[in-house]
């Protein structure tokens, strides 16, 4: 679990997301409260439940990006799902319980990687010795015992040095490794993924594990042997137990596009992919027990963060019970020209930095001037206002059009520096932004 304080979390999010201070503060406090809760005694800890969050704001303002970055910051099981992928229990499609199953799978993977990294040095030593056993020749029979030992020690040291330096990477050797029986591919009908996964595991385990001899390059042999030896040092039952505990105590679920499952006023009949999904989400958010292939998982203390644009609906269109279980509501603001300008230059790995790096691979150097950046931001904002506001995503469309000629002729401009100033932007974008037919900019 991350031990970062709210200001530290906000500072990290600031590196990638411009503005939206309220949303950043809300998620940073929620993340810190996960750590605070774990410091309490067991009785009080059980009573403290997470305060779930609903993020409201137009498309392209950073809701999904906050989730992506939060996943990296939170050293906890995390999963992002689209609300539109689910249908009500009893109908064809994914059931909401699969959210918890997927979260548990993510936790298993996370804990497994942690355990592998913990044993990394030991595994590397074992693999190195196995490779050396194959590489080092047996001493001649007519040698004395001391000659054998001395020669063997020198040879091992020589090969060990070459192995560590990567000199022998391309050399082929024959090794014995575990081979698993080929699994049977099963086409899963919607909503039956859990059953098909169990059937595939069953078929894979029927043949057991056998050793087989394979001739491989040393670099490939190291990869396979590392996986094999790492698996031997891992206790699967302990990993399952630890993963389920991590999910129950620190799990975070981000539900995107929740506005798309609001019931429409003019609809009639059973609403299996809208209100039905909301009803199925209720027990998960409130707290229930879900059966997974790794064991039973309680959802009482899992943090749920939902987000939606709510362009054709409002949060009050959600069923009242679900509204009550998302007590913290944060509104994200539409982006301005100044925000666009910052998005183009300030974040780590900004869009302009990405284009510059891509062109440098062909020996073309791009220089964006301050005036040029401002003009790009104004062009994107103008198109958003004229057609449909899709937020920061519009910058990708505008920049792609702006860089089209440079990208196409990059090989002919090797060694040149191209300055993208206000004149260049006006020449390539003004005609398009002033044109009434802006359909080409709609994503």
Swiss-Prot record:
Pfam families the UniProt entry points to: AAA (PF00004), AAA_2 (PF07724)
Keyword line: ATP-binding, Chaperone, Cytoplasm, Nucleotide-binding
Any single biological process term in GO: proteolysis involved in protein catabolic process
One GO MF term attached to the UniProt entry: ATP hydrolysis activity
CDD domains found in the cross-reference section: RecA-like_HslU
Amino acids binding ATP: 18, 60-65, 256, 321, 393
Subcellular location: Cytoplasm
Domain of life, per lineage: Bacteria
Family: Belongs to the ClpX chaperone family. HslU subfamily.
Function comment: ATPase subunit of a proteasome-like degradation complex; this subunit has chaperone activity. The binding of ATP and its subsequent hydrolysis by HslU are essential for unfolding of protein substrates subsequently hydrolyzed by HslV. HslU recognizes the N-terminal part of its protein substrates and unfolds these before they are guided to HslV for hydrolysis.
Protein name: ATP-dependent protease ATPase subunit HslU
Organism expressing this protein natively: Buchnera aphidicola subsp. Acyrthosiphon pisum (strain 5A)
């Amino acid at each position: 679990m991350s031990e970062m304080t709210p200001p530290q979390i906000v500072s990290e999010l600031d590196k990638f997301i411009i503005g939206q201070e309220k949303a950043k503060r809300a998620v940073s406090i929620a993340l810190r409260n996960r750590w605070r809760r774990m410091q309490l005694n067991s009785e009080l800890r059980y009573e403290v439940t997470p305060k779930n969050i609903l993020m409201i704001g137009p498309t392209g303002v950073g809701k999904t990006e906050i989730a992506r970055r939060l996943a990296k910051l939170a050293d906890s099981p995390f999963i992002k799902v689209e609300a539109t992928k689910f249908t009500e229990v009893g109908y064809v499609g994914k059931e909401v319980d699969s959210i918890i199953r997927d979260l548990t799978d993510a936790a298993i993977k996370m804990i497994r990687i942690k355990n592998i990294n913990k044993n990394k040095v030991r595994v590397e030593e074992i693999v190195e010795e196995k490779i050396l056993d194959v590489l080092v020749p047996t001493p001649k029979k007519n040698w004395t015992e001391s000659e054998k030992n001395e020669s063997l020690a020198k040879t091992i040291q020589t090969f060990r040095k070459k192995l560590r330096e990567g000199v022998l990477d391309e050399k082929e050797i024959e090794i014995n490794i575990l081979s698993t029986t080929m699994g049977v591919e099963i086409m899963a009908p919607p909503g039956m993924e859990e059953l098909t996964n169990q059937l595939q595991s069953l078929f894979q385990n029927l043949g057991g594990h056998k050793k087989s001899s394979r001739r491989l390059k040393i670099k490939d042999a190291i990869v396979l042997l590392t996986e094999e030896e790492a698996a031997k040092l891992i206790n699967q039952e302990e990993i399952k137990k630890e993963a389920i505990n991590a999910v129950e105590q620190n799990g975070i679920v981000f539900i995107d596009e929740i506005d798309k499952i609001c019931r429409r006023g003019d609809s009639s009949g059973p609403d299996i992919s809208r209100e039905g999904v909301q009803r199925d989400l209720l027990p998960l958010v409130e707290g229930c027990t879900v059966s997974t292939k790794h064991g039973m998982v309680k959802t009482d203390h899992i943090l749920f963060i939902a987000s939606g644009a709510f362009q054709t609906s409002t949060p009050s269109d959600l069923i009242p019970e679900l509204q009550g279980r998302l007590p913290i509501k944060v509104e994200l603001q539409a982006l301005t020209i100044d925000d666009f300008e910052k998005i183009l230059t300030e974040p780590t790995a900004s869009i302009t930095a990405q284009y510059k790096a891509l062109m440098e691979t062909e020996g073309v150097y791009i220089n964006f001037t301050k005036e040029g950046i401002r003009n790009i931001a104004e062009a994107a904002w103008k198109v958003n206002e004229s057609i449909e506001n899709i937020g920061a995503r519009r910058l990708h469309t505008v920049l792609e059009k702006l860089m089209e000629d440079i990208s196409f002729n990059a090989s002919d401009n090797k060694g040149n520096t191209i300055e993208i100033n206000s004149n260049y932007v006006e020449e390539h974008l003004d005609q398009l932004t002033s044109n009434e037919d802006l359909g080409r900019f709609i994503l």
